UniProtKB/Swiss-Prot annotation:
Gene Ontology MF term list: mRNA binding; rRNA binding; structural constituent of ribosome
Keywords of the record: Ribonucleoprotein, Ribosomal protein, RNA-binding, rRNA-binding
SUPFAM superfamilies assigned: Prokaryotic type KH domain (KH-domain type II), Ribosomal protein S3 C-terminal domain
Protein name, entry field: Small ribosomal subunit protein uS3
Keyword RNA-binding belongs to the record: yes
Superkingdom, taxonomy of origin: Bacteria
Start and end residues of each KH type-2 domain: 39-108
Originating organism: Caldicellulosiruptor bescii (strain ATCC BAA-1888 / DSM 6725 / KCTC 15123 / Z-1320)
SMART domains per UniProt: KH (SM00322)
Gene3D superfamilies in alphabetical order: 3.30.300.20, Ribosomal protein S3, C-terminal domain
Biological process annotations from GO: translation
A Pfam short name: KH_2
Length: 222
């Protein structure tokens, strides 16, 4: 089942945290989930070229904190912070006047971010680059940047073929069943003249010991 379950959801509460962190009663839960979806969709569409990997949302009463992880913070922030201010006003309007605070975090090594790697491969496929070339170049960059393993998969009418198929390449280790393994997962779609091509990426960065286990090991060493 390790091949089927979402690598991030599988590790929630162990080495990963939720991207949306808030509590709501039954009456507000549906509204907040829809609001989170609209916030993420708006940011991704508005700042598609900013290399946004992940958007975290925290709520407290009428305040909403949005944390944007991006490879190009300059595009998000804009000249003298004009981009952030404009985005904040748009999100306040989207959420019905709630107080929005934005926190921009830079992704230091975008070659090790699975979502950005998948989007990069998809962008190349839209430019008619060979899918094999795009996948192998992305894998080589990730391994050079320190990844311990990477797997990329593309699915659809590859090269304009009449029959859709799936192809994948793998380098190094991808221990999907090991819960302490820090495996990043990303998915993107390439919109080509032949139809959509799905791109999936798994990147293994090493092991993360859960805090309790790490603390007990540290105590045992003494």
């Amino acid at each position: 089942m390790g091949q089927k379950v979402h690598p991030k959801g599988f590790r929630l509460g162990i080495i990963r945290d939720w991207d949306s962190r808030w509590f709501a009663n039954d009456k507000d839960f549906e509204k907040y989930v829809l609001e989170d979806y609209k916030i993420r969709r708006h940011i991704k569409e508005k700042l598609y070229n900013a290399g946004i990997s992940r958007i975290e949302i925290e709520r407290a009463a009428k305040r909403v904190k949005v944390i944007i992880h991006t490879a190009k913070p300059g595009i998000v922030i804009g000249r003298a912070g004009s981009g952030v201010e404009a985005l904040r006003k748009e999100l306040e309007k989207l959420t019905g006047g709630k107080t929005i605070s934005l926190d921009i975090k830079e992704i230091k090594v975008p070659e090790l971010d699975a979502q950005l790697v998948a989007e990069n491969i998809a962008a190349q496929l839209e430019k008619r680059v060979s899918f094999r070339k795009a996948m192998k170049q992305a894998m080589a960059r990730a391994l050079r940047s320190g990844a311990k393993g990477i797997k990329t998969m593309v699915s659809g009418r590859l090269g304009g073929a009449d029959i859709a198929r799936t192809e994948w390449y793998k380098e190094g280790r991808i221990p999907l069943q090991t819960l302490r393994a820090d495996i990043d997962y990303g998915f993107a779609e390439a919109h080509t003249t032949y139809g959509r091509i799905g791109v999936k990426t798994w990147i293994y960065k090493g092991d993360i010991l859960p805090q309790k286990a790490a603390a007990s090991e540290k105590g045992g060493d003494k």
